[in-house]
């Protein structure tokens, strides 16, 4: 009887599902392209811990106070985490810009995104938390090694490689491309990430911000769009027209009217002064004209070669010609009268 009573219990134990494994943490779909922001988000959560009610607040309305503080903490934490993501987006779009410029763009985006000063400060703290330690750039490190090397060890190969790197970096300013990423999240939804950057080189003098146009169209209604227009020197970044909106369409505005001529565009993209570009263009035109004229003058098919004749050769041609002359007519029959024809029928003998 005891064994019969234990059978249903054994069946229930066998049919019971295994204990559920803990769900894996949600993976950021943009971590591969934009960089990991988990550490920055953890710093934001540690910076704004859960609120603890004081003794004097317990007698008023502890539930209402706790809800208000929890809401404020959630808002500040969200602003800080958004600052982390904004910094990674600005750094992804403007790879060639300096960290200070990326930090300035992120802070300007925070100023435009939030109205309250506390939220702006939290977003800026997220930008600072995501900002990595400044590392020496490979080009600058290579130049420093070349300059610090002794004169005997300085070779032409190092100078040539440095010159090639400078030319390649200058040529990158002419490249303007668009990236589109289609990522699938863990819940099966497809997220489209589009970037339309306008590459602008940041020089030492008159450095200008790059225009960043990022559209984040996800499954959630809060889509992120960042628009940064070229607004002049970096010290005026606070006055930048930067839009962080949740709409599907954003307007791009510009405060300054930049020079649109060819030399200004080339100077802005290459980083060279206008007078150097003008001199190079003028010399190129002169070289092309000189090559065209020299080609026309020295072309081998445009000349006929004549062999000069000496005086003896000229006389030889006149005295002894190579061809036979036509014999002159004979004068034997010149004085004789023409023959006379007689009519024999009319003649009478």
From Swiss-Prot:
What are its GO biological-process terms? branching involved in ureteric bud morphogenesis
The record gives the membrane topology as: Single-pass type I membrane protein
Span of the annotated motif Microbody targeting signal:
347-349
| GO CC annotation | Golgi membrane
Where exactly are the transmembrane stretches of this chain? 276-296
Quote the subcellular location field of this record. Golgi apparatus membrane
Q: Which domain of life is it from?
A: Eukaryota
Glycan attachment residues as annotated in the record: 100
Q: Span of the secretion signal? A: 1-22
Keywords (A to Z) from UniProt: Glycoprotein, Golgi apparatus, Membrane, Signal, Transmembrane, Transmembrane helix
Q: Does the keyword Nucleotide-binding apply?
A: no
Please name the Pfam families in this protein's record.
BSMAP
PANTHER family for this protein: TRANSMEMBRANE PROTEIN 59-LIKE, TRANSMEMBRANE PROTEIN 59-LIKE PROTEIN
Name the family: Belongs to the TMEM59 family.
| Functional note | Modulates the O-glycosylation and complex N-glycosylation steps occurring during the Golgi maturation of APP. Inhibits APP transport to the cell surface and further shedding.
Q: Can you say what this protein is called?
A: Transmembrane protein 59-like
